[in-house]
Amino acid sequence: MDSEFFQPVYPRHYGECLSPVSTPSFFSTHMYTILIAIVVLVIIIIVLIYLFSSRKKKAAAAIEEEDIQFINPYQDQQWVEVTPQPGTSKPAGATTASVGKPVTGRPATNRPVTDRPATNNPVTDRLVMATGGPAAVSAAASAAASAAASAAASAPAHPAEPYTTVTTQNTASQTMSAIENLRQRSTYTHKDLENSL
């Protein structure tokens, strides 16, 4: 009777209360979301690296091409031959270029001697202003003619066939404006290239 009285009384679900309840971790509940986010980030990084490298290659190629053109902007236009007009021929060693393209390195003996009046020459105009009279002009013209004749006598003889050359009177202002235009064009191209990066 005492044993019945002192028998322990267990509450209901006592075993369930003693078993540890494990709460699910954050990674286990959001595992698929985290994996999808990682894959998307890796894909975005790969695409950005590819775009940056291709743009860098294009910019490097453009800079290299621009540097080559800046070193020698007329490298593909130097000795451009044109077909002679019918009935004309060129002497040996003479080169003619198409209009608008520069010809560099021409020998001085290939330049034709023109008989323009002395007043059209800026050098003799300065001589007239310095000496003050047409007598000085005639003296300067005769000295220039004798120098041209001696240079023509010492120069190798060319065939007598006529040939056509385009002669332009180049002044210092024209040369400076051409250099300034080239400099502005190169600067603009470099700035445009830097802005495109």
Curated annotation (Swiss-Prot):
Sequence repeats lie at residues 139-142, 143-146, 147-150, 151-154. Signal peptide: none annotated. Interacts with the host light chain cytoplasmic dynein DYNLL1; this interaction is critical for intracellular microtubule-dependent virus transport toward viral factories. This is Inner membrane protein p54. The chain crosses the membrane at residues 32-52. Inner envelope protein involved, through its interaction with host dynein, in the intracellular microtubule-dependent transport of viral capsid toward viral factories. Seems to induce caspase-3 activation and apoptosis. Plays a role in virion morphogenesis by recruiting and transforming the host ER membranes into the precursors of the viral envelope. Involved in virus attachment to the host cell. It is found in: Virion membrane; Host cytoplasm, Host cytoskeleton; Host endoplasmic reticulum membrane. GO terms for cellular component: host cell; host cell endoplasmic reticulum membrane; host cytoskeleton; membrane; viral envelope; virion membrane. Induction: Expressed in the late phase of the viral replicative cycle. Residues 84-123 are annotated as: Disordered. Its main location: virion. It comes from African swine fever virus (isolate Tick/South Africa/Pretoriuskop Pr4/1996). Belongs to the asfivirus envelope protein p54 family. GO terms for biological process: microtubule-dependent intracellular transport of viral material towards nucleus; symbiont entry into host cell. It comes from the Viruses. Residues 163-175 are annotated as: Interaction with host DYNLL1. InterPro entries: ASFV_p54. It is a single-pass membrane protein. Keywords: Apoptosis, Cytoplasmic inwards viral transport, Host cytoplasm, Host cytoskeleton, Host endoplasmic reticulum, Host membrane, Host-virus interaction, Late protein, Membrane, Microtubular inwards viral transport, Repeat, Transmembrane, Transmembrane helix, Viral envelope protein, Virion, Virus entry into host cell.
